[in-house]
């Protein structure tokens, strides 16, 4: 993969209820973009995102995966997150590194608790968002119902961009609501122009009215630019929330979504990023400017028994290079990366440099953990650490074999390095060892 400049990058987190289709959407994105020649399936335990044995055994995501997609001369760093609340720490890590979010909603199940939690996270982190409705190839899926439910909850900012064309309860095409133009699917991920069927017109009018209301809430000038396809900031500001739809299994609608991500979502340099310059004790306005002193925030750690420890970083300023000597101000330690990588699931690819705003990984950093900042000794930067949910439930654990205490302690240290919502506590008063987590499922898997 080539090196991308800051304005060519989009960092997008996939959020949503468990089972809504985030991982299968990631697979469809890989396939449609040409990064994969076939789509993995959760049922076959061969998806790029769910590479962990526990994920493959259980059939759902446990940790966040980073998957880079190349589309329309841009690099889209997809952060595929778990949908179950037990693994909320992974979601919070991903959101802290994202510049925008796609909230994934099942067209069959509709708006769920996980949808609402995703929206709240976007509000908390001030993330621009889109909604993508999956499973539109399923008989009883309803795009219109999802749009109506979203509008009832979040108001007129909900802007449907597409309407499904269905025949014999199957998704066969779509109507671009903005352009009032039909497209019919010809093969997986492929489409051609078509007439708008008469039976679609009543629903089309409803969706177009919703779109017009959303746009009218802004300004007349914006309305004109919107329908002319010009660049605008209203989606970036959260005034408009586009809604797209498709089928992950058939890779239908995914190309539209990728194009909308490039068109509507901000590159990192349009977002703010501020830290503390410990050298001068002044505020450091990084703002993902590649011309400034280099700095990066470590938002995630992965400890893999086969490939070792990787620290996932988002470059906040400057350009990171493999031969850099970096400084961890929090740990008062120098770090020598040696090599830089981009990760696709658990597969590292070496790169020569990472521009401000990009997401990558560094192997085997000795003193660096999740939440740390890497910069240079001449310009020592610290960024505020992500505010993670606190573990609230616990279970007692016992070391089976005498003499294995050190082994267990080391294993727990590795687990807690990866998972910020796990916490081991030695209750000396009651002479017991406790492991805290976010729920029974979380503790069981740990």
What would you call each of these model-derived segments?
Residues 1-446:
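Structural and coupling elements of P-loop NTPases
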